[in-house]
Amino acid sequence: MPRSLKKGPFIDLHLLKKVEKAVESGDKKPLKTWSRRSMIIPTMIGLTIAVHNGRQHVPVFVTEEMIGHKLGEFAPTRTYRGHAADKKAKKR
């Protein structure tokens, strides 16, 4: 169930301060964050945010289409290596 519109988007305050500081100074360095639950807001457009996936920080360049999504959606936490091949099918 989506978040109520009357509540507004959730964004951690420490991340919001980092974003405002980066926009104000025009700094293009990636912003490191562990806050995967924060929603992408319009002031983040054009910034690179390094989102933690449990092992490393994944750089995410924020575009206009990402507004309203959460940062964690763009930093996958699991690696899929494929299913084991069926040995019987290979012999044929």
Curated annotation (Swiss-Prot):
Origin: domain of life: Bacteria
Any GO molecular function: rRNA binding
GO terms for cellular component: cytoplasm; small ribosomal subunit
GTP-binding is among the record's keywords: no
PROSITE patterns: RIBOSOMAL_S19
Keywords: Ribonucleoprotein, Ribosomal protein, RNA-binding, rRNA-binding
Entry-linked Pfam families: Ribosomal_S19 (PF00203)
NCBIfam families, sorted: rpsS_bact (TIGR01050)
Stated family: Belongs to the universal ribosomal protein uS19 family.
Protein name per UniProt: Small ribosomal subunit protein uS19
Name of the gene this protein is made from: rpsS
